[in-house]
UniProtKB/Swiss-Prot annotation:
The gene coding this protein: yfbN
Name used for this protein in its record: Uncharacterized protein YfbN
Upper taxonomic lineage: Bacteria, Pseudomonadati, Pseudomonadota, Gammaproteobacteria, Enterobacterales
Amino acid sequence: MEWLSEIRKLRKNVPVGIQVARRLLERTGGDVDEAIKLFHIDQINILTAKADVTHQEAENVLLATNYDIAEALRRIDEQRYTLTELILRKNKDAGDALNNIALAIEYEWDLKRKFWFGFADIQLLPPVLQTFMLVYEWHEYVGWEGMECGIFFESDHTHQQLQALGLLELAQKMVTARIRYDELKDKAENFHEITEDDIFKMLIIHCDQLAREVDSILLQFVKDNIDVFPCRHNRHEL
């Protein structure tokens, strides 16, 4: 291979593969020092275009990251955005975004998860985060156990927090479903028999339909209260 020793020397100085090193040397006629300069210029131009930063800003961050574009972009993002803002930018699926935000809250507030977080586990959080975490946990619980069980999950607190999010009809319909359950529990032989009651079934179906809004409303709630949500970057997987 042409310029084998030059390629080795170049790759000791800049993070490039063999083919990129060869192309740089072709452009400089085999001059390693000029190839290094050319690589630096190319990386600065790439970062300037990708991150919309000045030439000097690009050069500074690349010097700090050994001209690693991916790491440079990550550092620029961390300077521009809070952790929660980055999660929202990088997760277009609402469920994925909410899951990562919940994980960030767990990390920042050192919450110790055993299984499901109840109100007692999150009562020291700021009120906005209490609302988010309890409704998020409730919605996840419903996904696992079904709405028939979900109407009882931290029922008093969940009712209050759903109202705080403006989900008034859902909150009230869950109360109505619990009342119907109480009316039936002494007459029915088991839980399954209650769930087969036509009125109870219709109430649960209605709750499920109303709960389809929860993810989008929680996401908007985060955006409206972004300053309360985790800001610090901690190598959290976005």
